[in-house]
Amino acid sequence: MSKGEELFTGVVPILVELDGDVNGHKFSVSGEGEGDATYGKLTLKFICTTGKLPVPWPTLVTTFSYGVQCFSRYPDHMKQHDFFKSAMPEGYVQERTIFFKDDGNYKTRAEVKFEGDTLVNRIELKGIDFKEDGNILGHKLEYNYNSHNVYIMADKQKNGIKVNFKIRHNIEDGSVQLADHYQQNTPIGDGPVLLPDNHYLSTQSALSKDPNEKRDHMVLLEFVTAAGITHGMDELYK
């Protein structure tokens, strides 16, 4: 067990803070909840603290919760491939570019680390080149979320990982908005981290609303499990 992994043996409180600017529409979001890496479970509630969110909530899910991939459940035979926990408590910087097909892009930079007993994800998001009447700024996405696989590989030069995946957002007219994600994670501290063999995270997310919440918000339940490296096949993945 890495030193960082020891911090995730029970339920851990999570705080998420995001400052965003999409096509000049500025906004802030604050999220709170908890994670349980034993089950790969996240329960979070996000509130737009600046009024109405200028983009659809589902477009921010990967920035919020795929940002705290340290809560992914890694099976025993894969624990030596868990970069995310091994970088704790100092944490990691997570940088991402998200390309929305036939529309604009988000660039995000997050610092994910422990502050006391709380796992904090602080994010800056900049969005450019979005069409004002497109699926994103035109709010044409359904309020739901599909399951996805997130592909991880080691980046030995930067002592971190590279991650890529494609998200399918459901549109109200029955079509799909694709979003390509390119992600880089590098440790903040200078201690040893685990550099993984290629594998993936399987994610299931459910969005809901709090009937008692008057502010613009999103409630998220998510399960994340690492997979792709099987027992006794280590040689194939070297």
UniProtKB/Swiss-Prot annotation:
Which residues are reported to carry the modification (Z)-2,3-didehydrotyrosine? 66
Effect annotated for changing residue 80 to R: In Azurite; shifts the excitation and emission spectra to shorter wavelengths and increases quantum yields compared to BFP
Consequence of substituting residue 145 to A: In Cerulean; leads to improved quantum yield, a higher extinction coefficient and is 2.5-fold brighter than ECFP
Which effect does the record note for changing residue 103 to E?
Answer: In mut1.27; shifts fluorescence lifetime from 3.03 to 2.85 ns
Q: Which gene encodes it?
A: GFP
> In the UniProt annotation, what is the result of changing residue 39 to N?
In EBFP1.2; shifts the excitation and emission spectra to shorter wavelengths and increases quantum yields compared to BFP
An example GO biological process term is:
bioluminescence
Q: Which family does it belong to?
A: Belongs to the GFP family.
Q: What does this protein do?
A: Energy-transfer acceptor. Its role is to transduce the blue chemiluminescence of the protein aequorin into green fluorescent light by energy transfer. Fluoresces in vivo upon receiving energy from the Ca(2+)-activated photoprotein aequorin.
Q: How does it assemble?
A: Monomer.
Record annotation: effect of changing residue 193 to A: In mut1.5; shifts fluorescence lifetime from 3.03 to 2.72 ns
What effect is documented for mutating residue 149 to K?
Increases fluorescence at warmer temperatures such as 37 degrees Celsius. In Esmerald; leads to brighter fluorescence. In VisGreen; leads to brighter fluorescence
Mutation: residue 167 to V; reported impact is: In P9; increases fluorescence at 475 nm excitation. In R10-3; matures to the red-emitting state with excitation and emission maxima at 555 and 585 nm, respectively
Q: What is the effect of changing residue 64 to M?
A: In RSGFP4; increases fluorescence and shifts the major exitation peak to 489-490 nm
Q: What effect on the protein does mutating residue 66 to W have, as reported in its record?
A: In W; leads to excitation and emission wavelengths intermediate between tyrosine and histidine but is only weakly fluorescent
Cite the effect that the entry attributes to residue 68 to L. Answer: In EYFP; leads to yellow fluorescence, folds faster and more efficiently at 37 degrees Celsius and has superior solubility and brightness
- The protein here is known as Green fluorescent protein
Q: Impact of mutating residue 65 to A?
A: In GFPmut 2; red-shifts by about 100 nm the excitation maxima, permitting efficient excitation at 488 nm and increases fluorescence
